Design a protein with these regions (language model features):
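Post-transcriptional modification and biogenesis factors for structured RNAs
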Residues: 1-157
Length: 157
């Protein structure tokens, strides 16, 4: 049971490294959906994650279907600017639940068919019209800490 960050085919190694570092510091699991837009030996990935990689609970999946089969009872939430509800309107407070926050590629987001099939589980982070999107690692941190806040920051000081 816990909180899971899922990156669907991430492209920018520094974003993934920053997210991995946040996961290491919070006990949140990280799932990477292949294909990745970089090598896991990438210098920028390693640099962004610093020397915390041994503390990251990281999982690799060949596709979203593989993730869904591995965690059939997961409580999946899809982060997209097309979400009709904001992240703060969702309840992530049950520590016995597995919450999966699924993020799309930095350039394209999530596949439209996935969004359309899960509109009731799509959430957004409010922003003004001056930008197309927020940075992926910042967005992941917002969701990660909102779920942790709702659960009383378990095992964190």
């Amino acid at each position: 049971m816990g909180i899971h960050i899922v990156l669907y085919q991430p492209l920018i190694p520094a974003n993934t490294g920053n997210i991995a570092r946040s996961c290491a510091g919070t006990g949140v699991s990280l799932h990477l959906i292949k294909p990745l837009g970089f090598s896991t030996d990438d210098k920028m990935l390693k640099r962004a994650g610093l020397d915390y990689w041994e503390h990251v609970d990281i999982h690799y999946h060949d596709g979203l279907d593989e993730l869904f089969r591995a965690y059939p009872n997961g409580n999946y939430h899809y982060i997209t600017k097309f979400g009709t509800k904001t992240y703060s309107s969702f309840d992530f407070s049950d520590p016995q639940e597995d919450y999966f926050f699924v993020f799309g590629q930095e350039t394209k987001g999530l596949p439209r068919e996935l969004i359309d099939a899960n509109l009731d589980r799509c959430l957004r982070i409010p922003m003004n019209e001056h930008i197309r999107s927020l940075n992926l690692s910042n967005t992941a941190a917002i969701l990660m800490y909102e779920a942790l806040r709702q659960q009383g920051f378990p095992e964190l000081s």
